[in-house]
A protein has these predicted regions:
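Acidic/histidine-rich helix-loop elements
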Residues: 74-98, 132-142, 289-293
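Active-site beta-strand-loop-beta-strand hairpin of nuclease catalytic cores
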Residues: 66-69, 274
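N-terminal cofactor/phosphate-binding cores enriched in small/glycine residues
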Residues: 59
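Secretory targeting signals
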Residues: 1-2
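N-terminal export signals
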Residues: 6-30
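Flexible, acidic/histidine-containing loops and adjacent segments that form or flank the divalent-metal
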Residues: 28-48, 54, 104, 112, ...
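Conserved small/polar residues in nucleotide/adenosyl-binding loops
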Residues: 311-318
């Protein structure tokens, strides 16, 4: 059994094997003849992962080998309100994150402004936006509509389908009325609007599936590519599809809420020998009856094969 420390060590070693040393990587980049030239774009057969950093939002844009695309998270929150903990809004504060992200996507996307999939990993504002910090407030369908995160990006991008952890009932494993209330109200309004006016499909994320997030254009040409859904709503799935509920014992006490981070959606993208793991802010922990500390990251380490790892919380802590 691999513990969390071992898992993170393996992930770090994989990354280090690719990049060696951060300073050395920068040196390599400085010597690269392509530096400063226009980006050549995506080519068929490439699996590209674009980590989009704005300082106030988690966001990732993925281009599958056949050209299928996905925007994973697109948030916004009041960075200045964090005081001494505030970080700069990038590339500058003239625009909100949703617009910056959509501008970037339109530049690198082989389909320009059309994105096949969008996914909110969990209901926190820095991953999806909220109704308290926004670029603009409008009246749509007789009620307030806030352009923040995904809803702002959707003003510039067209999404074909959304994957969500608990749509349409918003009660898996508990009703989204406590910890995630702000982001929940925002995303529900966004989903309702997109269903009514933009013909976007919405589908609940299916834990354990390996074909839900599928290539849409030429899947048979790339049999070595797959996306395996490994965590959702406090549960994890191994390669055989066996599901373990990490919160099963805690549910017996009839709690009113769980940590939203622990509900994060997670996947392993596989392309040949390359594997990439990402799972929003997947993290939580509590003391067991025997006095030992249980961390859900330890549990997911058992179902994650050696892979390049990207999680928002780990990036901030290291």
């Amino acid at each position: 059994m691999m513990d969390r420390r071992g898992f993170l060590k393996n992930a770090t070693l994989v990354s280090a094997a690719c990049l060696m040393d951060f300073r050395e990587a920068l040196a390599w980049g400085a010597k690269d003849a392509e530096v400063g030239k226009a980006w050549k774009g995506w080519k068929k057969g490439q699996f590209q992962i674009h980590l989009i950093y704005t300082g106030v939002s988690e966001s990732m844009f993925l281009i599958f080998p056949d050209g299928t695309t996905m925007l994973l998270d697109c948030g916004d929150h009041n960075a200045v309100g964090r005081g001494k903990l505030a970080v700069p809004v990038l590339p500058n504060p003239d625009r909100h994150a949703g617009e910056w992200i959509s501008r970037y996507v339109r530049r690198v996307n082989p389909q320009k402004d059309y994105v096949d999939y969008m996914m909110l990993t969990h209901y926190h504002s820095d991953h999806g936006g909220n109704n308290k910090f926004y670029a603009r407030k409008e009246t749509r369908d007789g009620k307030d509509y806030y352009l923040s995160g995904f809803s702002q990006a959707a003003e510039y991008l067209t999404f074909g389908k959304a994957f969500d952890r608990c749509w349409p009932d918003y009660n898996d494993p508990l009703p989204l009325t406590q910890e995630a209330a702000d982001a929940f109200e925002h995303m529900k309004d966004f989903y309702d609007y997109m269903l009514a006016h933009k013909k976007m499909e919405i589908e609940k994320f299916c834990l354990g599936e390996t074909n839900q997030i599928a290539m849409k254009k030429d899947a048979t040409a790339y049999p070595g590519f797959s996306v395996r859904n490994i965590c959702a709503n406090g549960r994890i799935a191994d390669k055989e599809g066996n599901i373990r509920d990490l919160y099963a014992e805690r549910k017996k006490s009839n709690p009113v809420k769980f940590s939203e981070n622990g509900m994060s959606l997670g996947m392993i993208f596989t392309y040949g020998d390359f594997k990439f793991y990402t799972a929003g802010d997947f993290s939580d922990g509590w003391e067991l009856p025997n006095g030992k500390r249980f961390e859900i990251e330890d549990a997911i380490a058992d179902v994650v094969e050696p892979a390049v790892s990207y999680t928002h919380l780990r990036a901030h802590e290291t």
